């Protein structure tokens, strides 16, 4: 009797188990490993936020960050432009001060600032004003000089040829003023200057006129004793003078300077020259 009761109980449990299995999908009892179905919603949200915060961002031009970037660039450009403008103004003012100081120094030296009235090798009366606006290379000598004067005039001619090869530079006017007016008349000067640069102008005059021209440039000249033929040598300064278009002496070159060095010096003067007395 007891066995029958136990058997009936087991039979009922088995029936309940079978009905439970048939009425439910077994897949509902298998755990899903994906975050979307099994993980708590707040955990997935945290993971999405984490990935979003660590991903690279590009500022949108219309965004607040883009506007700030453009503002910084504009401010930087304006600041840099202000610095450059200030530097340029200071530089220009410095150049003006240098020019004025140079003018004052030249006035104190008072070299070559006087006028001259001489005859050129064609017999025309010439003054210093005739050469204003031109760069002038000036040499004092005499036509009977055996070697030094021809050498210096050859060097002067070479300097002018070197500068003439650069079309960006203004032309230079070479001048030759005699220190021996007794022998160097107009015809003697005409014969002499033709052996040098074609633009070379020879200038002569009376003893007093020549002496005054030399005095303005502080030229030393002294006649030596005459020989039995009446010939003599003139001892004089051996200097090539550079005069700018304002008619002011600005540099000089002695015998130690060669043609290349002189040409380079003149080129530098030309590049930095600013008219002090504009027309």
From Swiss-Prot:
CDD domains: SCO. It is found in: Mitochondrion inner membrane. The keyword tRNA-binding does not apply. Disulfide bonds join 145-149. One of its GO terms (molecular function) is copper ion binding. The keyword Disulfide bond applies. Residues 91-279 are mitochondrial intermembrane. The chain crosses the membrane at residues 73-90. It is a single-pass membrane protein. Keywords: Chaperone, Copper, Disulfide bond, Membrane, Metal-binding, Mitochondrion, Mitochondrion inner membrane, Transit peptide, Transmembrane, Transmembrane helix. Residues 97-271 form the Thioredoxin domain. One of its GO terms (cellular component) is mitochondrial inner membrane. It comes from the Eukaryota. GO terms for biological process: eye development; intracellular copper ion homeostasis; mitochondrial cytochrome c oxidase assembly. Belongs to the SCO1/2 family. This is Protein SCO2 homolog, mitochondrial. The gene is sco2.
């Amino acid at each position: 009797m007891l066995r029958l009761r136990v058997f009936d109980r087991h039979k009922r449990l088995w029936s309940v188990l079978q009905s439970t299995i048939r009425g439910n999908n077994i897949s509902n009892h298998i755990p899903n490993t994906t975050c979307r179905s099994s993980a708590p919603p707040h955990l997935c949200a945290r993971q999405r936020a984490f990935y979003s915060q660590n991903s690279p961002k590009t500022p949108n031009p219309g965004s607040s960050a883009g506007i700030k970037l453009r503002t910084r660039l504009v401010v930087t450009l304006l600041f840099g432009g202000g610095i450059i403008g200030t530097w340029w103004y200071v530089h220009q003012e410095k150049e003006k001060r240098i020019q004025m100081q140079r003018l004052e120094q030249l006035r104190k030296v008072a070299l070559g600032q006087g006028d001259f009235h001489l005859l050129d090798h064609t017999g025309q009366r010439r003054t210093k004003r005739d050469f204003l606006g031109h760069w002038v290379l000036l040499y004092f000598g005499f036509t009977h000089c055996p070697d030094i004067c021809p050498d210096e005039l050859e060097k002067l001619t070479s300097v002018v040829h070197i500068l003439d090869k650069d079309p960006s530079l203004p032309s230079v006017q070479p001048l030759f003023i005699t220190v021996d007016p007794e022998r160097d008349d107009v015809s003697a000067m005409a014969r002499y200057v033709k052996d040098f640069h074609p633009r070379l102008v020879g200038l002569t005059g009376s003893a007093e006129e020549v002496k005054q021209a030399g005095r303005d440039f502080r030229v030393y000249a002294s006649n030596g004793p005459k020989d039995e033929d009446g010939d003599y040598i003139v001892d004089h300064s051996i200097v090539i003078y550079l005069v700018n278009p304002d008619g002011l002496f600005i540099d000089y070159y002695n015998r130690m300077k060669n043609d290349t060095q002189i040409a380079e010096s003149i080129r530098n003067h030309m590049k930095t020259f600013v008219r002090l007395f504009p027309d």
